[in-house]
Structures are given as C-alpha cells and as structure tokens.
A protein has these predicted regions:
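Glycine-rich phosphate/diphosphate-binding loop of Rossmann-like nucleotide-binding domains
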Residues: 5-43
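Active-site-proximal loop->helix
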Residues: 24, 49-52, 79, 96-108
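Glycine-rich phosphate-binding loop
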Residues: 51-89
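Short, glycine-/small-residue-rich phosphate/pyrophosphate-handling segment
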Residues: 95-141
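Short glycine/serine/threonine-rich phosphate/pyrophosphate-binding segments
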Residues: 16-20, 44-48, 67-76, 95-98, ...
Length: 167
C-alpha cells in the first residue's frame, strides 16, 4: 500500500537510536513509510531549518523529533513547518529525562509540539500513524484493529484474574 504522506523520525544524536526503535517498529507494523535522519538543533541548526522547511514538499505528513537533555529539536523543527511535530523526550543522565520533557512540552503559543512520555517511542509511532489515518481509511482500520486487540488482551487478563479469585 502506498500512502500519500510519510513520517520523518529526526533524532538529535546517534545515541538516541536505540530509544526510537519502538517508533520504527510501530510505523512498520502499521505499514507507514518513514525515514530517519540525525539532525541536531544545536550543532546543525541550518540543517534542522532546511529539513523542516522542505518536509511537506518532500512528502512528509508528520515529524517525530527525538532528543535528550536540552531537547529543543522538536521546537526548532515546529518553528519552520506547519506539519504536526511530535516531540519524543529522551531520558538523559540529568534528572532522568525530566529536563528533556520540559524542553519539549513547554512551547510558546503558536508553535505547538505534541509530546509523548519520556522514551515513549512506541506512542510516538502510534500517534504519527493516527495523524495520518485522518485521511487514510485503510490505516484507520489497522489502528482500530490494534486497539481492539489491546482491549481483548485486557479482557483475557481479567478473565484469568476472576478465575484465580474463585479458587
């Protein structure tokens, strides 16, 4: 299946790559095309600006921006595009990632960034798919099946618990 739009997964450093694997896995699971790039808001700001300004023209529909510490990548990318930007704060050695979370979530009016949990790459991938599903019924159906499957697993766990409680 070919989608009109793809997801850009931008990471601030190659050390963030293991954390974003969950986003890659979820995007692949739902059949959403994606590309990954390493761009630093602080070390390569011109590249961040260039990527963001041209993302829509290059076929992207959503940007996931993953960074730790002074995690300004999502905000910098959001400043130069009208595409939805999902900030993925990465746990750092300082404050267990709280510094990253606050850097991503505290955006000024007019420059919104959707934010997932610290190291919440699975949810970043799912949220990106949900955004694209607004204009793709097949993708929306796959997401609905995924959510139904999660509900079924909860129901099964509850049934097992109820059986255990009877004994």
């Amino acid at each position: 299946m070919v989608f009109l739009k793809k997801v850009a997964v931008i990471i601030g450093s190659d050390s963030d790559l293991p954390v974003v694997q969950g986003a890659f896995d979820k995007l692949a699971f739902f059949g959403v095309p994606y590309e990954a790039h390493i761009i630093s808001a602080h070390r390569s700001p011109a590249a961040a600006e260039n990527f963001s300004k041209n993302a829509a023209a290059n076929g992207f529909g959503v940007i996931i921006a993953a960074a730790g510490k002074a995690a300004h990548l999502a905000g910098v990318l959001a400043a130069y595009t009208t595409l939805p930007v999902i900030g993925l704060p990465i746990k750092s050695s300082t404050m267990d990632g709280l510094d990253s979370l606050l850097s991503v979530v505290q955006m000024p009016k007019g420059v919104p960034v959707a934010t997932v949990a610290i190291n919440g790459s699975d949810n970043a991938g799912i949220l990106a798919a949900q955004i694209l599903a607004v204009s793709d019924e097949d993708l929306a159906g796959r997401l609905l099946d995924f959510k139904r499957s999660m509900a079924e697993k909860v129901d099964e766990a509850d049934k097992k618990l109820q059986e255990t409680m009877k004994n």
